[in-house]
């Protein structure tokens, strides 16, 4: 009976999380900097570095696997200093994001005047902050080191199945967490530590 109540409460929290999480995220943006940037942010930063159109357009119009994107980014790092500055994990995160979202359905005509933080699709970090705080704080998620299969298993449990995410979003979220979760608790601000909470 208690388990049913717990699941029901979690389900209700999931339903209302879309309304509650965004203000929370806005209020704690500085505190959440310990969570690694997702592909949307990394790609936005590359665009902000003002690469030539010849270098930028292939990033927005190509269709490749994560491995192919990773090789492409390495091959273009000399021409794209913003890519060269990324560490291995960030490059892998960006390649993963590109594999999910490129090519864009439509490339803006005026790329220089486009607000890319709004134009680009959400990344795994965005999805975690938008959807993973209905029943617990985000720290419960990002401090765990798990396989993709394990993450997808959790996302399919009754308490998580009610969260409004597409299968593709769930897959992308799991992939982001494989690359970026497992953050040591010492790197988490004390006010956001989960006191040992887990799934």
Residue spans of the language-model regions?
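Electrostatic cytochrome c docking/interface patches
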Residues: 27-47, 55-61, 78-84, 90, ...
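Sec/Tat signal peptide C-region and signal peptidase I cleavage site
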Residues: 20-26
């Amino acid at each position: 009976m208690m388990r049913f109540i717990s699941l029901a409460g979690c389900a209700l929290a999931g339903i209302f999380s879309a309304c509650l999480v965004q203000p929370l995220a806005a209020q704690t943006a500085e505190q959440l900097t310990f969570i690694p940037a997702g592909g949307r942010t990394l790609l936005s930063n590359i665009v902000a570095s003002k690469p030539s159109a010849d270098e930028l357009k292939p990033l927005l119009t190509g269709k490749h696997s994560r491995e192919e994107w990773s090789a492409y980014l390495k091959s273009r790092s000399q021409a794209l200093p913003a890519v060269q500055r990324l560490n291995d994990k960030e490059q892998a995160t960006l390649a993963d994001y590109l594999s999910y979202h490129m090519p864009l359905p439509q490339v803006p005509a005026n790329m220089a005047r486009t607000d890319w933080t709004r134009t680009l699709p959400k990344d795994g970090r965005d999805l975690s902050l938008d959807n993973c705080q209905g029943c617990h704080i985000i720290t419960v998620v990002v401090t765990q080191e798990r396989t993709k299969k394990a993450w997808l298993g959790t996302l399919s449990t009754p308490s998580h199945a009610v969260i409004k995410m597409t299968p593709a979003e769930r897959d992308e979220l799991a992939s982001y967490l494989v690359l970026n979760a497992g953050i040591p608790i010492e790197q988490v601000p004390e006010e956001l530590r989960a006191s040992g909470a887990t799934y």
